Amino acid sequence: MRRPHFDVRSSRWILTLFLVCAIAFAGCGGDESGDEAAGDAPDADDVAITIEEGDRSPAITGAAARFTSPENGAVLESGADVMVTVDVDSFEAGIQTETPRADAIANSENGQHVHIIVDGGPYYANYEPGSPFDVGMLPDGAHSAIVFPSRSYHESVKNAGAMDFVNFYVGEEAGTFPFDPDRPTIIYSRPKGLYTGVAAERIMLDFYLHNVALSEDGYTARYQIREEGGDEVLASTTLHEWTPSFVEGLPDGTYEIRLELLAADGNVVPG
């Protein structure tokens, strides 16, 4: 079985994420027969890969996350792990989100949580808001962290004001913050991680928007899926509303997902 990366490109942040995501299906067998089963899986050319726009899950009224540390503009110690603390309002971490979608796609047994994204990297899932959370050692210079609430199946809570950010330095006040709150921003969230069995049959794509709205005649969001290192687009969709989407038909393999924010003229918004 090949173990993939997702190469994720945001129109606001040009970034490369190395997210392990093996797409496998029930019946592949155990370790002894795994190679044979993976070899018999259909190629991407032999199946219909689709991206279907979905509906938002029911709203969690008033849910919001906010950083309480570090402070915006803080200069943190060089050579030490960076700790952030997040508080939440009208949101309960650690419980299952009670919707039919929780049984239909990959769902965390640890329940609801917040997604913390540092410098455009893969999100950290924090299941214990209110306690310091370690995001690791960061190089000296300018950094940005974003947080928003997430349902147990990793769909972001898209309430107005649900997201927060903090810009800070490590070691010295040098460099440019990756996140500019005054610019239109699209933030990649899902998929991430290892997908096997039933969870691999329907995979959610999700993102977060800041300072921008999608519409038929304005900004839009575009997904493109390719095999790792390939040029051919296997599936693509353009969204005019801020909703999750769902991928079906991906065989075993390694895939790259590109997420872009497009202006009304169809050009990628620089950033």
Task: Give the predicted meaning of each segment.
Residues 51-58, 89, 93-172, 192-271:
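Long, low-complexity serine/threonine/glycine- and acidic-rich segments characteristic of extracellular
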Residues 45-79, 169-198:
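Short, compositionally biased P/S/T/A/G/V-rich stretches that sit at domain boundaries
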Residues 29-32:
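Bacterial signal peptide processing site
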Residues 81-88:
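Beta-strand cores of secreted/periplasmic/IMS beta-sandwich domains, seen most often
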Residues 2-15:
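Bacterial N-terminal signal peptides that target proteins for export
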Residues 24-27:
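C-terminal motif of bacterial Sec signal peptides marking the signal peptidase cleavage site
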Residues 37-38:
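Intrinsically disordered, low-complexity segments enriched in small/polar and acidic residues
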Residues 16-21:
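Sec-dependent N-terminal signal peptides
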